[in-house]
Structure formats: C-alpha cells, structure tokens
Amino acid sequence: MKKYVCIILLIAMGCKGVSQEKEAVTEKEEEQTEAFKVVKSEEEWRKELTELQFYVLRKAGTENPGSSEFLKNKMAGTYVCAGCGTPLFKSEYKFDSGTGWPSFDREIEGNVAFDVDYKIGYKRTEEHCAVCGGHLGHVFEDGPRETTGLRHCINGAALRFVPEEQ
C-alpha cells in the first residue's frame, strides 16, 4: 500500500512541476513578444501565413525533413522571414548538411536572435527572427569547420527566397 501512495505522490508532484513550467514559458513568451518590432495577433498571423508557416513560425513547430522547396535551391539571393520579410540568410552561406533541412553556416548579423530551448529534454539554441519573433530552427556546432563551424538548421516554411537581381 505504501508503494502505491508513493507512486501517486510522485505523479502528482510531477504534474504540478510541468504545469508551473508551462506558465513560466507563457509569461516569457509574452515578455519576448513585447520586444519585437512587428507584433500581430494570432488571428492576423493566421490570415497572412499558410497553415505550415503558422505552425513553424508562431508555434515553434518543425516541418518534415526533406519537405522544403529550398533544400536543393542553388540560386543566388537572400532568404527572408516568411512572416515579416526581414533578410535572414544569404544564399552564399547555404550548404548541404544532409539533415533534410536548409542549412547555413551563418546568419545576417542582427536579424536573427537566439534563445535556449529545452523542449525535447536537453539544451539547444533556438533561432528566431529578431523583428517578428518567428521561430526559424536551431543552431548546432557541427557545421563546416573551414568557415564558422556552425549549422543553422532552418525550417524552409519559415523562409521566403528573394532572387538576386540580375
């Protein structure tokens, strides 16, 4: 009987901790939203974005690997935020990481912001648009050694491509 009581207590304590964590994350998200230059309601974002773009940019979702139209794009130009049009990555920074997501070895400085993400149980560096706060992806330290050593693993749904003028 003591065993069952202990198990129930452990489960109850675990649920309480998760509930408090979610509240803290929500408060943090609200604070971050106030800091962005482009702020829109959820309804406004839904009207402007596709379902997948909304899921990735506004709900910090992840598109399926290999599904991005930009994965094999070799054209010269700039990748901009699909939410607000802020230039984020230049095509010259793009490389084939073999991960299934568009990858870049660096961002356009000042236009991408970083935060810590523990959503899957361990620490990762999340990237988001510095202007509208849209979730872009994550940055890892396993990129090309001959450049920055970084791999910005980006959801193609978070991007639009603007070809270089010829």
Regions inferred by a protein language model and the residue ranges of each:
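Sec-dependent signal peptide cleavage junction
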Residues: G17-E44
